[in-house]
């Protein structure tokens, strides 16, 4: 017997990375998981090196970032890799979630995989927010102030909870230090969740674009899918390198190169681009508590998809109506991202409310109604063919 099968730890790696049977019909959209793993490794590695030279004291935070940029050997490169790596992490994550919704990867028996994936998404957003704050530029300070103030909308405990989060009466030294500590911890929690995600996926294996059982037509992960993954890894690294070396600040905000000043409010307070759709949902509700509930509900509503999707056929590959509404949903989500960076004024307020309503209607109304309709059409077609 080969050593990769007889040795305890190697046999575990073998069952996941070498002999793992995968559907032969997997397309390149299924490579996003490996790209997300690569992004996580890049973020952890670059983050550890940045933490070696960063000071979390509020009076030194901004200066220490500039010290990394100017004085540390290749410090500018490490920082740009980390900053752009966060953006590319979310590009791959949003694409991965979109792929899962399109191909019905959340349906039984992979509900646990989907639930863990949503938890990973939430922790990743929290990690990104915490990391954006401890740069302590102007946008970092006011972003931390605005987002943490949202907790004051919680009835009864909100007013006391915000100073507890700050560790003071405003965003100050304890806030930045605890945000840095949590930001350093979160990627390792993510790594543990990713392992759980893979373990849950390994039970039933990957789904496939056709939405049918592929048990009779599978291929070993190595070397078919390893080399297939390498194709997208090289493409990813090429595009990533173009941003890091030639346009490192495109995905950032210029106000964050100004030291944080609690006495000067920026013209517009916006988070990083990958949080904009949910920020737009938050702003579209006039009531503060309602906006906070809507923002968190917009993320947690992903968990209802295994329940609301009643289709007997997995995925949208052969379903024209579902496919049409999915692309309308995709356009609506991009629209929310655009609205999140615009000023709160007419007509963007009404457009944001309309897009928010469409976002929730997709999960609550469109998916169950359309899937039920397509089930009826499916059974009519099967009876007619028989």
From Swiss-Prot:
Keywords: Electron transport, Heme, Iron, Membrane, Metal-binding, Mitochondrion, Mitochondrion inner membrane, Respiratory chain, Transmembrane, Transmembrane helix, Transport, Ubiquinone. Pfam families: Cytochrom_B_C (PF00032), Cytochrome_B (PF00033). Coiled coil: none annotated. Disulfide bonds: none annotated. Binds 2 heme b groups non-covalently. PROSITE patterns: CYTB_CTER, CYTB_NTER. A ubiquinone binds at residue 202. Heme b b566 binds at residues 96, 197. Its cofactor is heme b. GO terms for biological process: mitochondrial electron transport, ubiquinol to cytochrome c. InterPro entries: Cyt_b/b6_C (IPR005798), Cyt_b/b6_C_sf (IPR036150), Cyt_b/b6_N (IPR005797), Cytb/b6-like_sf (IPR027387), Cytochrome_b (IPR030689), Cytochrome_b_C_euk/bac (IPR048260), Cytochrome_b_N_euk/bac (IPR048259), Di-haem_cyt_TM (IPR016174). The chain crosses the membrane at residues 32-52, 76-98, 113-133, 179-199, 225-245, 289-309, 321-341, 348-368. GO terms for cellular component: mitochondrial inner membrane; respiratory chain complex III. It is a multi-pass membrane protein. One of its GO terms (molecular function) is ubiquinol-cytochrome-c reductase activity. The keyword Transmembrane applies. It is found in: Mitochondrion inner membrane. Heme b b562 binds at residues 82, 183. Component of the ubiquinol-cytochrome c reductase complex (complex III or cytochrome b-c1 complex) that is part of the mitochondrial respiratory chain. The b-c1 complex mediates electron transfer from ubiquinol to cytochrome c. Contributes to the generation of a proton gradient across the mitochondrial membrane that is then used for ATP synthesis. Belongs to the cytochrome b family. Heme 1 (or BL or b562) is low-potential and absorbs at about 562 nm, and heme 2 (or BH or b566) is high-potential and absorbs at about 566 nm. Fungal cytochrome b-c1 complex contains 10 subunits; 3 respiratory subunits, 2 core proteins and 5 low-molecular weight proteins. Cytochrome b-c1 complex is a homodimer. This is Cytochrome b. The lineage of its organism: Eukaryota, Fungi, Dikarya, Ascomycota, Saccharomycotina. The gene is COB.
């Amino acid at each position: 017997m080969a050593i990769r099968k007889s040795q305890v730890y190697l046999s575990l790696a073998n069952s996941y990375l070498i002999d793992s049977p995968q559907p032969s019909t997997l397309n390149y959209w299924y490579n996003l998981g490996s790209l997300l793993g690569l992004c996580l490794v890049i973020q952890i590695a670059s983050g550890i090196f940045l933490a070696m030279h960063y000071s979390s004291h509020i009076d030194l935070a901004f200066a220490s970032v500039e010290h990394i940029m100017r004085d540390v050997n290749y410090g500018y490169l490490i920082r740009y890799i980390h900053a752009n790596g966060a953006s590319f992490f979310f590009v791959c994550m949003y694409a991965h979630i979109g792929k899962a919704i399109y191909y019905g990867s959340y349906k039984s028996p992979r509900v646990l995989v989907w639930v863990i994936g949503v938890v990973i998404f939430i922790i990743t957003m929290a990690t990104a927010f915490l990391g954006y704050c401890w740069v302590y530029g102007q946008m970092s300070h006011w972003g931390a102030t605005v987002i943490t103030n949202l907790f004051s909308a919680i009835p009864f405990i909100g007013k006391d909870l915000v100073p507890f989060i700050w560790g003071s009466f405003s965003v100050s030294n304890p806030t930045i230090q605890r945000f840095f500590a949590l930001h350093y911890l979160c990627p390792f929690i993510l790594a543990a969740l990713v392992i759980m995600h893979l373990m849950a996926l390994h039970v039933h294996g990957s789904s496939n674009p056709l939405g049918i059982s592929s048990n009779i037509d599978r291929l070993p992960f190595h070397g078919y899918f390893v080399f297939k993954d390498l194709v997208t890894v090289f493409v990813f690294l090429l595009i990533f390198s173009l941003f890091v070396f030639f346009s490192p600040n495109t995905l950032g905000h210029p106000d964050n190169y100004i030291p944080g000043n609690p006495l000067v409010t920026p013209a517009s307070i916006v988070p990083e681009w990958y949080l904009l759709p949910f920020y737009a949902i938050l702003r579209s509700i006039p009531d503060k508590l309602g906006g906070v509930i809507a923002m968190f509900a917009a993320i947690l509503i992903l968990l209802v998809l295994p329940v609301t999707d009643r289709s007997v056929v997995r995925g949208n590959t052969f379903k024209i109506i579902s496919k049409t509404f999915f692309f309308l949903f995709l356009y609506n989500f991009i629209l929310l991202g655009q609205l999140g960076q615009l000023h709160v004024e007419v007509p963007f307020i009404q457009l944001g409310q309309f897009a928010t309503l469409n976002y929730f209607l997709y999960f609550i109304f469109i998916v169950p109604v359309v899937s039920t309709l397509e089930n009826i059409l499916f059974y009519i077609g099967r009876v007619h063919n028989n």
